[in-house]
């Protein structure tokens, strides 16, 4: 399992997070799981499945780069 956790402080009261995780699933596929939301709140999540690690890693990097461009910083 590979994980990247990012945070963004938009105001003093709102601490946002964005998490990207790469893991193998039970069907020998590689999953990219993304979660985002308010810290301490209920997160939203999306899971994408890929046939190989290279494609999953590229997708995870795209999502992480997009989050960093939007102001999220590594934890």
Which residues does each PLM region occupy?
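A general marker of short, structured functional hotspots
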Residues: 3, 13-14, 23, 46, ...
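A broad, low-specificity signal for short, low-complexity segments enriched in glycine/proline
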Residues: 7-11, 36-37, 67-70
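Short aromatic-glycine-(Arg/Gly/Cys) micro-motifs in beta-strand/loop hairpins
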Residues: 20-46, 61-62, 73
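Negatively charged, low-complexity tracts enriched in Asp/Glu with abundant Ser/Thr
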Residues: 1-14, 40-41, 51-53
């Amino acid at each position: 399992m590979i994980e990247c956790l990012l945070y963004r402080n938009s105001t003093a009261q709102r601490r946002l997070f964005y998490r990207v995780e790469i893991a193998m699933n039970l069907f020998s596929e590689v999953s990219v799981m993304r979660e985002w939301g308010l810290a301490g709140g209920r997160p939203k999540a999306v899971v994408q499945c890929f046939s190989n690690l290279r494609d999953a890693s590229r997708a995870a990097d795209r999502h992480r780069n997009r989050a960093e461009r939007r102001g999220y910083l590594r934890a």
